[in-house]
């Protein structure tokens, strides 16, 4: 029987599968950060769907990052993140409706948005309630229409409600929310693997 994503990822936290995700996603995340972080300009940062907090820890060490925050729907993942580094700020909440007390300059997410009931809603929420003017959203996904190898993941992982969308559909979500300078590219393509689809736009 398929389960909701929070249940599955909470179980993965117990089984330490989150460390495997960190290893598998590291190159794509670095590619996104290299693109999004402008040299020497101070910035604030949120990782949406932060898991065990590895990206938050990574970004917090960048000299011009003045604040790095993580949010995740899995209490077990957040507890793990806080245990690894109690000094950083982590929130366990529904990212569809949550909003930071103070807007930020950069929102990042890796392998999260297609698990949500309404991906367009989180993109709208980030645009309206998370980002400063000229702030940037950047996110990566491996489960998308053009990446045929990924199509059976909902069945093989036993996760319900996964949204299989095309690159054009994701682009449209950002543009319809108001994002400008929207662009996409792929990272890590190889035989039988289209690579991580990366999408970014500015508020």
Please provide the spans of the model-predicted regions:
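Conserved class I S-adenosyl-L-methionine
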Residues: 1-38, 145-146
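Class I SAM-dependent methyltransferase SAM/SAH-binding core
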Residues: 46-97
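A conserved beta-strand element that flanks and buttresses the S-adenosyl-L-methionine
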Residues: 108
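A short glycine-rich, Lys/Arg-flanked "PGG" loop and its adjoining helix->strand segment in the class I
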Residues: 120-133
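Conserved beta-strand signature within the Rossmann-like core of class I S-adenosyl-L-methionine
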Residues: 134-142
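Short, glycine-/aromatic-enriched active-site segment of Class I SAM-dependent methyltransferases
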Residues: 142-161
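Short alpha-helix
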Residues: 162-178
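Core SAM-dependent methyltransferase catalytic element
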Residues: 186-203
């Amino acid at each position: 029987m398929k389960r909701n994503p929070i249940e599955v990822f909470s179980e993965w936290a117990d089984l330490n599968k989150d460390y495997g995700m960190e290893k598998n996603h590291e190159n794509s995340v670095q590619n996104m950060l290299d693109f999004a972080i402008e040299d020497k300009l101070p910035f604030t940062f949120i990782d949406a769907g932060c898991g065990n907090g590895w990206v938050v820890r990574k970004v917090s060490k960048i000299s011009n990052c003045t604040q790095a925050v993580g949010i995740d729907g899995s209490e077990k993942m957040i507890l793990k993140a806080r245990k690894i580094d109690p000094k950083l700020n982590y929130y366990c909440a529904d990212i569809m409706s949550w909003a930071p007390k103070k807007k930020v300059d950069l929102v990042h997410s890796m392998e999260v948005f297609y698990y949500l009931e309404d991906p367009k809603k989180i993109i709208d929420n980030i645009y309206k309630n998370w980002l400063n003017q000229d702030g940037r959203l950047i996110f990566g996904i491996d489960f998308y229409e053009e990446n045929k190898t990924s199509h059976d993941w909902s069945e093989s992982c036993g996760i319900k409600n996964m949204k299989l969308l095309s690159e054009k559909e994701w682009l449209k979500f950002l543009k319809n929310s108001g994002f400008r300078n929207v662009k996409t590219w792929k990272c890590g393509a190889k035989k039988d693997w289209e690579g991580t689809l990366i999408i970014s736009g500015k508020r």
